[in-house]
């Protein structure tokens, strides 16, 4: 009997394969959509920029005029001491949060709500932004970073600007240790060893004098977890012949 393979250990959900969420800053979203925002604006000040292990972009701690402190996503160029406004009468300026109906066409935005008051669901990745294409009665057309155009309720809020943290993927890791700790912070397991490179006790494709599966790589849908590796329930494999 061989050892349990990686998919079996991952499915068990032990601490090795769980994301260390106890280190995360928590939910990062817009402030509650209250009457103060619907009729005017709320003003806050950036008091601190923080690193969040859960994401690749910095987050800002903002202290609002009523004394409330909240972590929010901020655009490129934000610094400690900047003033942030939230509400229908907020100024059209990077970092401010307004309903889509109040934002002109062509302005870059991020952290867009899917439903009014849900805190933000779209365009939250580092360095990304969406663009308002057009306003219509009861709907706003927004082009997402993927290029897809989606309609939103005009009451949904968004933050003006380009999401901070851009260029993250352009910087090389250089060292394997950095890549390991980066993956570990999100619960990823790295490096991922190939089955044919393992010993026979560790994987069905392991062992032998040279690296090869040594058996058919197609596997039935109902086979047990310890054997279920390779092409699962494949209708065909390979490139196929030209007809």
UniProtKB/Swiss-Prot annotation:
Alphabetically ordered keywords of this record: Ribonucleoprotein, Ribosomal protein, RNA-binding, rRNA-binding
One function term, GO molecular function aspect: rRNA binding
Compositionally biased region (Basic residues): 228-243
InterPro entries: NA-bd_OB-fold, Rib_uL2_dom2, Ribosomal_uL2, Ribosomal_uL2_arc_euk, Ribosomal_uL2_C, Ribosomal_uL2_CS, Ribosomal_uL2_dom3, Ribosomal_uL2_RNA-bd_dom
Example GO biological process: cytoplasmic translation
Pfam families attached to this UniProt entry: Ribosomal_L2, Ribosomal_L2_C
One GO location term (cellular component): cytosolic large ribosomal subunit
Region (Disordered): 1-23, 204-243
Subunit structure: Part of the 50S ribosomal subunit. Forms a bridge to the 30S subunit in the 70S ribosome.
Matching PANTHER family: LARGE RIBOSOMAL SUBUNIT PROTEIN UL2 (PTHR13691:SF16), RIBOSOMAL PROTEIN L2 (PTHR13691)
Database matches in HAMAP family: Ribosomal_uL2_A
Family annotation (NCBIfam families): PRK09612.1 (NF007180)
Known role: One of the primary rRNA binding proteins. Required for association of the 30S and 50S subunits to form the 70S ribosome, for tRNA binding and peptide bond formation. It has been suggested to have peptidyltransferase activity; this is somewhat controversial. Makes several contacts with the 16S rRNA in the 70S ribosome.
Family statement drawn from the similarity comment of this UniProt entry: Belongs to the universal ribosomal protein uL2 family.
Protein name, per record: Large ribosomal subunit protein uL2
Gene: rpl2
